[in-house]
Amino acid sequence: MTDQAAERAPISGTTAGEISESVRNLVGTGRLRPGDAVPPIRELATELGVHRNTVAAAYRMLVAAGVAETRGRRGTVVASLPRLDGEAAANTELVDLSSGNPDPSLLPDIAAALAKLDYHPQMYGSLAVEPRLAAWARTTFTPEVDAPFEVSVTHGAVDAVERLLVAHLTRGDLVALEDPCFYASSGTVRLNGFRATPVPVDAEGLDPRALRSTLDAGARAVVITPRVHSPTGVSLTAERAREIRSVLAHYPHVLVIEDDHFSAISRHPYHRATPDTARRWALVRSVAKFLGPDLRVAVVASDPDTSERLGTRLRPGATWVSRLLQQLVVELLESDAAAGQFARARLAYAERVDTLRAELAAEGVETPFPTDGFNVWVPTPHGSAAPVAALREAGWSVRDGGPFLTPASTASPGIRITAAKLTQPQARELAQRLGAVLRSTSG
């Protein structure tokens, strides 16, 4: 349908609920399609003989339900199904610096670990959390979490964040996200009908003043990356974590989720951002970056109520995480080789990232964030599409930063470069190429 579709599709009703239901029926039958505009509030109110506040309330109900979205001057339109971005597959024809994958040579030997497992088949009704993994989690989390907690296991960090938000929020609730933001988090927020509000990130992490403003505006949850923020690579300093705790202490009802996805191989210590006053909180640690992306496991420490809510969604006999997978993960984590393996990965990624940043600096390309992990964020104030296309033509695949920016983002556009396998000669060649591209586009 065209933008005039709603004029031909009869919307009826005299109450906000009836009007909202009428529009939903039109969408359900295909008479209104994604992108179609509904009539302006005043126009529909006149047509139906109701007060414009009634129509405005109906439209708010549609937005909260995820059926419609506001488009500024375009008014209210039927919403499309949100697109949830993911990491790209490695491009074999180009030098792959876009996929976000770790270096396979720095991952442990999974086949050897499998051979050591004393696995016994688990039946319906078995424990949802592998006892050995739960014990490892308690030993690991207890020195860093000064609060009573329970242990849950989810299908990775993205799964954990989604389950936590869905367990505590309702459609239309406001969620504070870092800006720029890990695309999976913003996609999860959109997909579940929540509203994202961006909070800027600087060289020390999440801006506490902006966070306070967002919480004052009604945010009911905040997702924080304490180490190796994606895409910038920033880790919270001790002082910034203290400032964030101080702010959050005044909002004990807010759900605080810390996504510590790079934990075992980060070059920085963990600084807790969750205050003691938080009633609803979770610390999530996945294993994809240091054990391998195919091991879809995250260990979650959370307050008991949140753990119980997660448990209802990860029930034994229904949606639990495979105990075989859990046993494999804890076998790898507790192996004699683990500490050395993680230390080698930590050092290698640090050297590769630092080398790339130094080569970029030599070409006048700024990387303003102190970077941990294996990705480097390069701001491109004049847009990211042209640099991405130019590098691709020259044989380099980098990640366009667009998906990391929410609709209300104030962050600079940028590109993300995965340096996990980058050699020094490659870093120099890439820096020279990117420097030339950015100089040409800035003129």
Q: What is the meaning of each model-derived region?
A:
Residues 97, 154, 199, 284, ...:
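Hydrophobic residues at beta-strand termini and immediately following loops
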Residues 102, 227-229, 289, 422:
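Short glycine-rich anion-binding loops that position phosphate/pyrophosphate groups of nucleotides
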Residues 121-252, 264-279, 440:
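Conserved core of the PLP fold type I
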Residues 174, 195, 255, 366, ...:
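Residue-level detector of anion-binding/catalytic polar loops
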Residues 1-123, 135, 139, 315-322, ...:
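N-terminal basic, amphipathic alpha-helical segments
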Residues 177, 258-259:
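Hydrophobic residues in beta-strands of the RecA-like P-loop NTPase core, especially within AAA+ ATPase
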Residues 283-360, 367-368:
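PLP-dependent aminotransferase class I/II
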